[in-house]
Amino acid sequence: GRWRGWDRRGGEEMLELNRLYNMDCMEGMKQFPDKYFELAIVDPPYGIMNKTKRGGQRSPHKYKVRSEEWDYPPTADYWKELFRVSQNQIVCGGNYFTDYLFPNNAWIFWYKHQPVDNYADGEFIWTSFNDKQGKCFDYMYYGAINSETDRFHPTQKPVALYKWLLKNYAKPGDKILDTHVGSASSLIACYDMGFDFIGFEIDKDYYEAAQERMRIHMQQQT
């Protein structure tokens, strides 16, 4: 099949497509030439996971969050490298990273209808597509995500969101990059829609859970 995972910590040759790698995305992106990926769809940590987006304390037990590895906001070097290896970018929670993103009018607002786990009832998604109008993705997030039995990541996005993004912003044949895979929703969407992809997840536990989620999903497709 197209999907494979790989626990990899280094190497010189360019990484293979259609794999999820358990490694630092900064090390991974270094192995690709300029503008190799037509589109990067990323959901970096905001650095605020010890609190909800509304300011309250999160439950310390619902999800495994290790601040030293997972919940660390990207540095300026990350954004420089992301823009180097990708032609266009979509950034979930882009309003947290405006210091690094150029201003434009092509934002997406993901309307969730009701808050989830004390999170806001919507999320801003930045895109680099200056030639496109702003859009709204209206999705009954709460019922849909809680009906999934495989939710294990604190900022897990529904596969439907990524499929909508790919349908509206990607072209057939595009190679897709996700630097912080988390729950693998992005990779499942790429797999289902026939896009080549590369994913990175630095956290070993999230990596293994994402691998298992992909494996089960693929079995269900056959």
Can you name each region flagged by the protein language model?
Residues G1-L177, S183-T222:
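Class I S-adenosyl-L-methionine-dependent methyltransferase catalytic core
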